[in-house]
């Protein structure tokens, strides 16, 4: 994974989504228009965290670069940068971190 020059703000996370399933477990090929959006990806960059209610200190984000995360199906904003597709998520859209 190449270093990306995108730095998310506040509690935002830049994720490179995993590949959508191309075949069912029984061997049937899934056409492009029927593929489910992946809900798993690798964290590429993390923002510094959002400010607390007093604005005195930042609340850090619970994930780090390189973590594999599971995120909300409809969360985030899809972007394309240097020919690669990414997703910018709020930390609230991350449901779990996958253990390695």
Swiss-Prot record:
This is Co-chaperonin GroES. Belongs to the GroES chaperonin family. One of its GO terms (cellular component) is cytoplasm. Pfam families: Cpn10. HAMAP family: CH10. It comes from the Bacteria. Heptamer of 7 subunits arranged in a ring. Interacts with the chaperonin GroEL. GO terms for biological process: chaperone cofactor-dependent protein refolding. It is found in: Cytoplasm. The keyword Chaperone applies. InterPro entries: Chaperonin_GroES, Chaperonin_GroES_sf, Chaprnonin_Cpn10_CS, GroES-like_sf. Together with the chaperonin GroEL, plays an essential role in assisting protein folding. The GroEL-GroES system forms a nano-cage that allows encapsulation of the non-native substrate proteins and provides a physical environment optimized to promote and accelerate protein folding. GroES binds to the apical surface of the GroEL ring, thereby capping the opening of the GroEL channel.
């Amino acid at each position: 994974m190449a270093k990306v020059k995108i730095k998310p703000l506040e509690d935002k996370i830049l994720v490179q989504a995993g590949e959508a399933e191309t075949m069912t477990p029984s061997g049937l090929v899934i056409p492009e228009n029927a593929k489910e959006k992946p809900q798993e990806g690798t964290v590429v960059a993390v923002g510094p965290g959002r400010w607390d209610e007093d604005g005195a200190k930042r609340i850090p984000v619970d994930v780090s670069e390189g973590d594999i995360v599971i995120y909300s199906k409809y969360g985030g904003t899809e972007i394309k940068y240097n020919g690669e597709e990414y997703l910018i998520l709020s930390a609230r859209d991350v449901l779990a971190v996958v253990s390695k």
